[in-house]
UniProtKB/Swiss-Prot annotation:
Pathway: Cell wall biogenesis; peptidoglycan biosynthesis. Its EC number is 6.3.2.13. It comes from Leptospira borgpetersenii serovar Hardjo-bovis (strain JB197). The lineage of its organism: Bacteria, Pseudomonadati, Spirochaetota, Spirochaetia, Leptospirales. This is UDP-N-acetylmuramoyl-L-alanyl-D-glutamate--2,6-diaminopimelate ligase. It holds the Pfam family Mur_ligase_M. The keyword Ubl conjugation does not apply. ATP binds at G118, T119, N120, G121, K122, T123, S124. Carboxylation is probably crucial for Mg(2+) binding and, consequently, for the gamma-phosphate positioning of ATP. Its cofactor is Mg(2+). The modification N6-carboxylysine is found at K227. Meso-2,6-diaminopimelate binds at R395, D419, N420, P421, R422, G471, E475.
Amino acid sequence: MKMKLTNLLHEFPELKLGSLPSGKNPDSVPIEYIQSDSRKTNPEDIFCVPESIGTKKGEFISNTKASVILLHRSSNISIDSSKIVLECEEDPEQLQGRIASFLLGHPSKTLEIVAVTGTNGKTSLTNILFALAKDQGKICGLIGTIGVKFGDRSIDTGYTTPDASSLNLILKQMKDEGVTTVFMEASSHGLKLGRIGGISLKAGVFTNLTQDHLDFHSDMEDYFESKFRLFEILDVSKSPFAVLDYSSPGGNELHRKIRNNLPDLPIKALDGIGGEYKVSNPFLTLQGTSYVLSLPGNRSQTISTNLLGSFNVRNTALAFLTGLGLGLDPKGMFSSLKEIPQIPGRFQIVYSKDRSRMAVVDYAHTPDALENIIRSVRNSRPKRLITLFGCGGDRDKTKRPKMARIAEELSDQVILTSDNPRSEKPEAILDEIQSGFSPGFTPLLREVDRARAISEGVGILPEGGCLLVAGKGHEEYQIIGKEKRHFSDVEEVRKAFGLF
């Protein structure tokens, strides 16, 4: 039997009827689902009107097919009298996930869901966890920046963390197709906007906290609080646990906050003071990475992986700790870590035909990520390291000069180009980046056309040299103005090397 509006009002007392058309009765109004995208609504849906859309509320409400409108009680908007209006005291987006979960029969309740948050490393860590669990027979799902993956399906959602309605629908699909374990990225946007509300989580994993998204968050404290929110919403009925990198930026502070506010939540901390899990003796090459991980009982294990870069020492160690919490076999994990499938756009190497030169494509688009990838590439001792990067338009502008300083200090030469300029003028973005260079420093090339910049960068690369192409990684598009064009760093590098 289809859900009725009266069932919803009973389940969520915070919802109040703002208006009910004459002749309508909550007992007879069918409710199919809830959506915050007016384009996805059907007549029996609820259109959730987020506060974040501001002055466009009226426009979206007039375009929706939904018969029920949910909005903040302070909204002063004229609504067609044929619509049913529901009101609430909080931002409706914060309720959306719980309502979506209720309407779908709480699909996440029977799933083992691990959410990973942090400025950098979310995509790599969730992909590593997916591989480890799958190798041990678990039927897994993956949700994140690269898309959604389960069974033979691969879906591009366009978001690191999909909106709450889409997320619950994805989880229901996964559950219906036999998935038992899900690894998902939890972005700070998703956490602050309530996209994970109503999701029953088994574990939360924290990688690090460095500057990003200050165009969205008021300051770093607000950014941190959004990350902490993940651990507050873990499902206590699932014996939840937390995993964090104590030595990473923000790790110490998060550990302390969890201890003070969530004293019953078990924590597995990497490199914590007095902790049982510590990393030592990392050895990095272009063939792979190895390190020693200390374990409880004065034991240790050398871990080897095909993944490259110092950051993957942290990622694989955190994945191992998370796997322990999920009951995965340690020996099986040690074996699986040796051959993790290439994560698209993460330290992805492309060699020239004769392998005398190489390019590294990486998603690094924050100061910390750029520094980490340049240092990791440096470990391969290229004869010359040229770093090519830009910064996204309509995003945090304060990181632009910082990334310039990092590129100048750690690279032999620098090429400036466009990332996703969006509504900003590409040359203006490059001006702001270039303001971070020291007096007298001039980039090797300044070219807003990213394809041309990559081609010229490869063209001047000497034998034994490396071109680091940073910022877009796996992305297969470039946003210029309002237009989303096909574009792939990997494709452009391969073209420049004459590989196709």
